[in-house]
Structures are given as C-alpha cells and as structure tokens.
Amino acid sequence: MKTKHLRLMQRVYIILFFCFMYLPIAYMIVFSFNQSKGYSLFTGFTFKWYRSLFTNASILHALWVSVEVAVLSAIIATVLGTAASLGIASMSRKSRLLVTNITYIPVVNPEIITGISLMLLFVAYQRFAAQSAWLPDNIMGLPTLLIAHIAFNVPYVIFNVSPKLKQLDIKLYEAALDLGCDPRQAFFKVILPEISPAILSAFLICLTYSIDDFMISYFNCGTVETLPIAIYSMTRKKVSPEIYALSTIMFVVILCIILVSNAMESRSYRRDQKTLRKEGAR
C-alpha cells in the first residue's frame, strides 16, 4: 500500500514539475497565434504575427547577426576546443588536472562577470591600439562579439570532446603508425572518426549557447544587435505578440538542435557499448 502511494506521489510530483517548467512556454506558443494583441483571452487563430515578424527589418537584421555570430563562433570554438582537448589528453596527470580545473572557471563564472571582464579587455585594447599605427582600434561591434562568443564556447567543446578522448584506445593510433601511417594520417583515419560524434555534438551546443546568449553579448556588442538583445529592447517598450512569435521560433529551433545533439550522443553511446560487447565476447 505504501509503495502504491509513493508511486502516486512520484507521478504527481513529476507532472507538477513538468507543468511548472513547460506551461509558460506552451502558453506563449498558443498566444503567438492569437488574433488579438491581448494575452488573457484567445480570440482566434492567426499567422499574422509571424507574417509581421518576417517583415520587420530590424528583427531580420538581428536574426542575421545572431546566426552569423553563432555559426562562426561555433566553428572556430569547435576547432580550438578540439585542438585543446588533444593537447590536454597528451599531458601528464597533474598538468591535465590543473588545466581542466582552470577550464572550469569560465563555465561556473557568472556571465555578467565574464561579459564585463571581456568588455574591459576590449576597451584596454582600443586604448593601446589608438597609440599604435598598425593595430585596428575600432573593433567594438561584430569583431568583439565574435571573440566573446568564441571565448565562452571553447570550454564547452573541451568538456564534450575530452571524455571521448579518454575512452579512445591509444593502441589503435599506435597500430596505425606501425602500419605505415604518419601522425597526420593516423589522426584523420583513426582518432577523428572516433571523436567526430563528440565534436559535432559540441558544435551544436556552441550554436545553441551562442544564439541564446544575452548577458555577454550585451556588454560586448557595441552598436550591433543580436536577437536576444533585440527582444529585450522590444520588451522594454511593450510586449507585442511578435515577441511571442519570435520566442516560439527560437524555442523550436533550439529544441531541434538539442534533440539532434542528444540523438547523436545516444547513437555514439550505443555504438561504444556494442563495440565493448564484441570485445568482451572475444
């Protein structure tokens, strides 16, 4: 009897938890199709707020900036983070532990501190560059935004790729070298295919965080507006149904990216387990 009550309480708790988490999002999605501008009564179904959204030049420009920065920063951060992971994996145990702990700092650091510190760095650079004849001094805007996004994305790549490198059997790499491959060929033919799911997953995570970021972008964007900053500017005046439509689109896109990333990780895990079972059977 107690077991049944416990199970019932667990189910009720789970239902309440998910309602608390996702009912506001569901409410927003429903009212993005509301015919009226009000958000207390649903008067009819319409796509006019979505049509209005895609004719808004400032929103489209902010969307383009966000996509451009997200894709570029994700690509660069993935390359840098993967290279860093390979370097960390080749270190001694103490050095690897030290570097890993240092890498944790940007992740656990509050975003407002990261944003302000990067802004101060760029301001200091501009003052130094103003006294130099060969350094560009007017970098506030897209360049600083891109650098800031790369800076906070690299640790996520390292934390995603490093565990996969730990699972990698180094004997495969050594066997490739013994069979006549040079280090570059052994990397591209042995190591890269093994860690490619983690690399792609890290890229998608960087893409998600970059599109969603507000705090760090706000302090380092200069005169450039990303999509979260544009939404914030719109909400300061009045909450329009266009914001509901835009937020719905962002939610769906980010949800799709997360689902793809999780599916890839799950597929990689199943493949690793299958390989381990085959090796155990031998």
Show the residue positions of the predicted features.
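Transmembrane alpha-helices
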Residues: 13, 18-25, 151, 157-164, ...
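C-terminal transmembrane helix and the adjacent membrane-cytosol boundary/short C-terminal tail
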Residues: 2-12, 162-177, 187-189, 244-282
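Non-cytoplasmic
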Residues: 26-37, 157, 198-232
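Short membrane-interfacial helix/loop motifs at transmembrane-helix boundaries
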Residues: 23-57, 121, 220-222, 275, ...
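Transmembrane-helix boundary motif in ABC transporter permease subunits
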Residues: 1-7, 72-103, 116, 120-124, ...
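Interhelical loop and adjacent transmembrane-helix boundary motif
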Residues: 2-7, 50-58, 211-268
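Membrane-interfacial helix termini and adjacent extracytoplasmic/periplasmic loops
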Residues: 38-40, 47, 112-150, 184, ...
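Membrane-embedded alpha-helices of multi-pass transport/permease systems
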Residues: 23-26, 30, 79-83, 116, ...
